[in-house]
Amino acid sequence: MATSSIRSRALGLSRRARFETTRLPFIGRRYKSDETLNRISSKITQPKSQGASQAMLYATGLTEEDMSKAQVGISSVWFEGNPCNMHLNDLSGIVRDSVLRAGLVPMRFNSVGVSDGISMGTAGMRYSLQSRELIADGIETVMNAQWYDANISLPGCDKNMPGVLMAMGRTNRPSIMVYGGSIKPGCSAKGQKLDLVSAFQSYGQFITGQIDETERFDIIRNACPGKGACGGMYTANTLATAIETMGMTVPGSSSCPADDPKKLVECENIGEVVKNMLREEIKPRDVMTRQAFENAMIVVNVLGGSTNAVLHLIAIADSVGIKLTIDDFQAVSDKTPFLADLKPSGKYLMNDLYSIGGTPALLKYLLKEGLIDGSGITVTGKTMKENVASWPDFPADQDIIQPLSNPIKPSGHLQILRGSLAPGGSVGKITGKEGLRFEGTAKCYDYEDAFIESLERGEIKKGEKTVVIIRYEGPKGGPGMPEMLKPSAAIMGAGLGQDVALLTDGRFSGGSHGFLIGHIVPEAMEGGPIALARDGDRIVIDAEEKVVDLDVPTEELDARRKQWKAPPLRYQKGTLKKYCALVSDASHGCVTDGPI
């Protein structure tokens, strides 16, 4: 079958010819499969009343025997304009052939995507979080309208992962994710290991005179050497690892680099995996249980993962009918040590973790230490514990994952803070390297670029304790809750990490580090206290007490509230206008179909 499929492609034969490479026994005017795997697609391929449906399918190249086979929707978030996604069409072709070899009918389709790295710091970033909903809605639409029996999704960039998982949760048909993989590290002319965050931080270094133009250009020219998602424990790798932990990928998918031959092997073998899922009726809601989400939250904290995991795991849980809250994250963070010396706060990249065994070795270690539960079923049909049992242990001399006896921080870095500035909650990314308490005077900016301009003018001084507030960047105010990587990277690049805390109703990239508090609820557009803060106000952030307070008398805040007026929405037409009308707040995952 494999040889026949390769020969068919080489000769440039039609899709119909490729489908004809394997035939089932002919019985009368029907072809019969030895298994009934087409439980969904049979609704259109079998009834005489659906003859027009069948005529259309014959036109796509299906044969008579194909009408009795299960149909697998292969959804790729491929587009050329992003290294995270540019190779996914090639991978989906390998997946298609694998599905064909398994005796199933592959049906490829595509979804939209946004490059967070390219759109970062621009109005384009307002479309990023909203693309998660478009991906989920698009895959759900095609899977249901086309009556596909199973789904294989190939995501690459940040919002791709939660988008495809939300669609899987909604449709609840046998589904599996194949992660596109991480990019290799870049290298500067001086031999310095680089990644995308190096490029973002180079601007702060440049405007403060730490590097010249030649050095700046060397960094941006060499930071991203090819295909794959951003290489640190940023949002894409955080989500991919969490999803593998939940059991929705084959072992090793999240840590295997984009250009590693094993990524091709993963795609070549995926057809039999999904066939077994169809046979055993393993569905997303069987895999993504509350315990699976508990495991995912633990692993995110162990790895020092992105704050976006809070938003996205809440939304994925919502899609399978599980109510996950920001308080669940705090409960996990309180009992989970931070162990991984990975960027952005550490020095290693995902490729380095892969070199010592990757995600399966990490899960095996955490199982041995009793931090996670390995009893849940996964897409392989086995439990997590069974999946990793034969996987090699971490080498004894590795220093990427610290032992439990010597954690980087004894509790998690994700902190849920409430207080007079964020009564509905906020999410802090506090590794401990920047301290656990910050007190300073507010400098308020109503949009991201206003802060960058202020930094360029030298208005943020080293030695002064400043709390930068960037507001009207929430789900409705942004809209789309854009990420503040450009400001946070500029702060760190300018050497102001110990002098500045950054608060926002927007989000932070997984590449951000420093004293950062985002996801502030209520957002400024809704009249939350963040909208009432003024330059010179005293702000107190205490990670141990889990508070973020605006130290202004109640009477003064009441007076300011009476004077406050909501600004007009930035978009009065189009997809972002619709998004503003539907989106929930950050504490409820920014879902658009109503939180459970």
Swiss-Prot record:
Name of the gene encoding the protein in the UniProt record: pbrD
Identification of the protein by name: Dihydroxy-acid dehydratase pbrD, mitochondrial
Binding note for cofactor: Binds 1 [2Fe-2S] cluster per subunit.
Family: Belongs to the IlvD/Edd family.
NCBIfam families per the UniProt record, alphabetical: ilvD, PRK00911.1
Signal peptide: none
GO cellular component: mitochondrion
Keywords: 2Fe-2S, Amino-acid biosynthesis, Branched-chain amino acid biosynthesis, Iron, Iron-sulfur, Lyase, Magnesium, Metal-binding, Mitochondrion, Transit peptide
